[in-house]
Amino acid sequence: MRYLMLLSGTNPATPPPPELFEAIMKLGGEATEAGVLLDTAGLLPSASGARVSLAGGSMTVTDGPFTESKELISYALYEVRSKEEAIEWGSRFMKLHRDLWPGWEGKTDILQVMGPENFG
């Protein structure tokens, strides 16, 4: 099963500490070695993006930044055996933020990607 993990958070007053990046790289290496991490990348702030909306039959393009209070920060695509395994990887990632960047607040949404098993 594939799971997409989307990290979002507030824009804190302090930049992330270098130790956090080192720990994230180590965890990513471990997930890659285990064969479960398929792709991951950071995302630029929404100010550099756009949104295409459809409402009432009309399409609208809106340039960022978007008004949501939390920014999408990064994504990761995992292939794991179960939802529980996906949650374990996501939890480990969030624990790094808790332990190495006190005061930072955010969330990781873990969404299953549709696959052949969903079209039975």
Per-segment meaning from a language model:
Residues 1-120:
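Conserved, structured core segments of small domains
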